[in-house]
Regions:
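Positively charged n-region of N-terminal signal peptides that target proteins for export
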Residues: 1-6
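Bacterial N-terminal signal peptides
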Residues: 7-18
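N-terminal signal peptide c-region/cleavage motif recognized by signal peptidases
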Residues: 20-22
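Short, well-ordered beta-strand elements
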Residues: 25-38, 56-61, 149-154
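Pocket-flanking alpha-helical
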Residues: 43, 63-99, 189, 193-197
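Ligand-binding cleft/hinge of the Venus flytrap
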Residues: 46-54, 132, 140-180
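Ligand-binding pocket segment of bilobal, Venus flytrap-like solute-binding proteins
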Residues: 71, 78-81, 154-199
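A conserved helix-loop-strand patch within extracytoplasmic ligand-binding domains
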Residues: 100-155
Length: 199
């Protein structure tokens, strides 16, 4: 673990990696990877640099947010290269305060989460807020073929923290009376659903 302290690679917040020039050929680094594309890319790049540039043995474990973050906090995983802080604010703040993890930087500062509607539809129907989505005639525009009488809001994948956040928001905003919180099942299916909305 001395190597990890030298590199200061305990926790990479939202992706940016920061390394010193220290190297150790007898090191092992355990990376945590997630089940979405940008995290996979960042983890692969970090693994390549650590292995080829520093001569370390690299192990990578892939999973959903909850188990990977738990393993990071328990120090079973050394590095993650991306995390959505808004989804885990208290856990991250607590572990930063305890010194369990170290924040090194940000690589995607403009990343945001929320409910989105394509601009042509929003402009045509005057959609400006969540309240507008609760009109029955608007919900019909997004009909869920598996839930007659309700619209479909394509959510995050079950296992991602944002899925639970969206589920709570549906109930708090009263959207659950009009829409399903649809789990697309995979990152690829989520991408396809978003792209399909513009056809």
């Amino acid at each position: 673990m001395k190597f990890l302290r030298n590199l200061i690679l305990s926790f990479v917040f939202a992706g940016a990696m920061s390394m010193t020039t220290s190297a150790n050929a007898d090191c092992k680094v355990h990376l945590g990877d997630f089940d979405w594309d940008s995290a996979n890319i960042h983890t692969a790049i970090a693994g390549y640099i650590i292995e080829k540039g520093y001569g370390c043995e690299v192990e990578s474990t892939k999973g959903s947010t909850t188990p990977i973050m738990a393993a990071l906090f328990d120090q079973q995983i050394d590095i993650i290269t991306e995390v959505w802080r808004d989804n885990l604010v208290q856990l991250i703040e607590d572990n930063l305060a305890k010194g369990t993890i170290v924040e090194l930087g940000v690589n995607t500062p403009s990343s945001t989460q929320g409910f989105y509607v394509d601009k042509p539809t929003a402009d045509k129907y005057g959609l400006k807020s969540v309240e507008d989505m609760k009109k029955p005639e608007i919900a019909k525009l997004f009909a869920d073929p598996e839930a007659p009488g309700k619209g479909r809001m394509t959510s995050c994948i079950s296992g991602w923290t944002c899925y639970t956040i969206n589920l709570v928001k549906h109930k708090v905003y009263g959207l659950d009376k009009f829409y399903t919180n649809f789990d697309p099942g995979s990152g690829g299916a989520l991408d396809a659903a978003i792209a399909g909305g513009f056809k």
